[in-house]
Amino acid sequence: MTNIRKSHPLLKIINHSFIDLPTPSNISSWWNFGSLLGICLILQIATGLFLAMHYTSDTTTAFSSVTHICRDVNYGWLIRYLHANGASMFFICLFIHVGRGMYYGSYMSIETWNMGIILLFAVMATAFMGYVLPWGQMSFWGATVITNLLSAIPYIGTTLVEWIWGGFSVDKATLTRFFAFHFILPFIIVALVMVHLLFLHETGSNNPSGLNSDADKIPFHPYYTIKDILGVLLLFLFLISLVLFAPDLLGDPDNYTPANPLNTPPHIKPEWYFLFAYAILRSIPNKLGGVLALILSILVLALIPHLHTSKLQSLMFRPLTQALYWILVADLLILTWIGGQPVEYPFIIIGQLASVLYFAIILIFMPMAGMIEDSILKMD
């Protein structure tokens, strides 16, 4: 008799995706973050659903409803902080996942890579809208500043901004629609994740060496299910520690002040995971130029497969590009720090230099390093 998991139409799909999936035998712990992202997404949808049961998307009651969740709902504080810090975990895993793809040349599976970039944009949009919902000072002013950037679009900009706002300023209509979008987007993300996995399983996973591993594959279960469970346990340990010991560590104190359109906070800044892009936006004195740089800071990832000049896929055997890669990581950390600093000397010039370096490494230095390494190895 055939095993039911191999014959049942639905179980067959799950079997081919998570059980009998042929997987390279040498993938390292850097490959754990895909499954961790899946866990983060499930956690965010689950906690978000319970928060939505108690939240009200009205400007007069939104702030109070979040306070009510924390004070009066059973374990409401736990659900709220799991959701808020879960978003930070989500982005930590996302950045490592993208960084792994860049380091080991996984971007050569172009469909999977492009789907991942679309997912990154979708998650960033969801997180931005979620940050507006508690209706604190930073929620309100963050929404005002970021949506206002669209007014830089020639001719239709102002009309577009007012259309998104649902009026002449960020108000009740804006909050209601942001709540609606924040609720629906994670389910769209789930669908996109399925497409992402569909493309991935067409080609199979890459591995640290960047070489074809068809000759040496092992089943995903039990080897990598066990390995993923260890990753999940470590993720939960980190998340629970953050939630129970320092729940507001990554938040902004300004968001504990109810939104006030008449009082601007001294430093408007987004959550930590957007600071690198915010620093790039601020480093350009022109509004439209800044908006384009902001979008390109993520969209530039789509160019990476087309700028791959080396005959070796992974950076494992390419020390020159490896050095550039780690300079890029350091540069992103500098941009993150600059994004949280006030707009004054010396932070302005540091931000501008770091922004130029970010684009230069990806667009110029890495492709050049690939060609230099090929010529050193006499592979051209």
From Swiss-Prot:
Gene3D superfamilies referenced in this protein's UniProt entry, alphabetically: Cytochrome Bc1 Complex, Chain C
InterPro entries xref list: Cyt_b/b6_C, Cyt_b/b6_C_sf, Cyt_b/b6_N, Cytb/b6-like_sf, Cytochrome_b, Cytochrome_b_C_euk/bac, Cytochrome_b_N_euk/bac, Di-haem_cyt_TM
GO biological process: mitochondrial electron transport, ubiquinol to cytochrome c
Consequence the record notes for mutating residue 42 to V: In strain: Isolate Emaj556 and Isolate Emaj614
Annotated transmembrane regions: 33-53, 77-98, 113-133, 178-198, 226-246, 288-308, 320-340, 347-367
Residues that hold heme b b566 according to the record: 97, 196
Result after altering residue 327 to V: In strain: Isolate Emaj614
Mutagenesis / variant outcome for changing residue 356 to I: In strain: Isolate Emaj614
Localisation per UniProt entry: Mitochondrion inner membrane
Requisite cofactors: heme b
Membrane topology of the entry: Multi-pass membrane protein
Positions that bind heme b b562: 83, 182
Pfam families according to UniProt: Cytochrom_B_C, Cytochrome_B
Main location: mitochondrion
Co-factor remark: Binds 2 heme b groups non-covalently.
GO molecular function, one term: metal ion binding
Binding site for a ubiquinone: 201
Record's miscellaneous remark: Heme 1 (or BL or b562) is low-potential and absorbs at about 562 nm, and heme 2 (or BH or b566) is high-potential and absorbs at about 566 nm.
Functional note: Component of the ubiquinol-cytochrome c reductase complex (complex III or cytochrome b-c1 complex) that is part of the mitochondrial respiratory chain. The b-c1 complex mediates electron transfer from ubiquinol to cytochrome c. Contributes to the generation of a proton gradient across the mitochondrial membrane that is then used for ATP synthesis.
Family: Belongs to the cytochrome b family.
Quaternary assembly: The cytochrome bc1 complex contains 11 subunits: 3 respiratory subunits (MT-CYB, CYC1 and UQCRFS1), 2 core proteins (UQCRC1 and UQCRC2) and 6 low-molecular weight proteins (UQCRH/QCR6, UQCRB/QCR7, UQCRQ/QCR8, UQCR10/QCR9, UQCR11/QCR10 and a cleavage product of UQCRFS1). This cytochrome bc1 complex then forms a dimer.
Name of the molecule in the record: Cytochrome b
Biological source species: Eliurus majori (Major's tufted-tailed rat)
Gene: MT-CYB
